[in-house]
């Protein structure tokens, strides 16, 4: 009809993108994914005092297939990481992730083997929110900033995962593979930290991850010795310097039985000083 000759190029396409992004920004449905104390502040944000429904987010969906925003509120344990990734993969595209609190963003005070040191090791994060825990006003400010990012972003959302590995975001982790502890070749190890590798039990001799946290050449998953070296822990815990390690045949077996405890008590009584008496009830 000659309409394209009267309008500058790209006007209709730009209008469609803006309309689509405006619709997505105005109707974000978060997934119910509270993990720790930050979830209390997230629930307060949805209550009447702050009224998150003003921004079109009054519905927290219990099904990830009906949500497009994941608010990770709290620390993520190593056992929760595969579940988090599975829920993220079940969310339809386009989708966004908001890391709420320092525990979800970087591990926070939980710098140990049981906590993932940042949820960005598992899923791509679009907005980081500091605080321990952040107040509802801070969460609403982060959501508004995310709205602005969505409005200015492409209509196709973020870059999709590609088989060639050109995407800057982690690839999906197979939950069954991660729980089974299979070799590292069947996992995406580009972004696995040391704690993540311990969680997925990458065996000795497997390819070393190249992501952040990959410091040791080999991760040995064998069980530790029964007794730590006395030079390190002996004096602090009262272990004699000449203490001998436990029998290897029993070090990894079941704990001591009642008979073993009784034998140890008899041995201690026989080694007591002469003339020592014990009160009996």
From Swiss-Prot:
Source organism, top-level taxon: Bacteria
Listed Low complexity bias regions: 257-281
Any GO BP annotation: electron transport coupled proton transport
Upper taxonomic lineage: Bacteria, Bacillati, Actinomycetota, Actinomycetes, Frankiales
Name of the protein described by the UniProt record: NADH-quinone oxidoreductase subunit B
Cofactor info, note text: Binds 1 [4Fe-4S] cluster.
HAMAP family, per the entry: NDH1_NuoB
Primary location group: membrane
Chain's role: NDH-1 shuttles electrons from NADH, via FMN and iron-sulfur (Fe-S) centers, to quinones in the respiratory chain. The immediate electron acceptor for the enzyme in this species is believed to be a menaquinone. Couples the redox reaction to proton translocation (for every two electrons transferred, four hydrogen ions are translocated across the cytoplasmic membrane), and thus conserves the redox energy in a proton gradient.
Cofactor(s) required for function per UniProt: [4Fe-4S] cluster
Keywords: 4Fe-4S, Cell membrane, Iron, Iron-sulfur, Membrane, Metal-binding, NAD, Quinone, Translocase, Transport
Chain sites annotated for binding [4Fe-4S] cluster: 37-38, 103, 132
Membrane topology label: Peripheral membrane protein
The reaction(s) this protein catalyses: a quinone + NADH + 5 H(+)(in) = a quinol + NAD(+) + 4 H(+)(out)
Record-level GO cellular component terms: plasma membrane; respiratory chain complex I
Subcellular location as annotated: Cell membrane
InterPro entries, per database record: NADH_UbQ_OxRdtase-like_20kDa, NADH_UQ_OxRdtase_20Kd_su
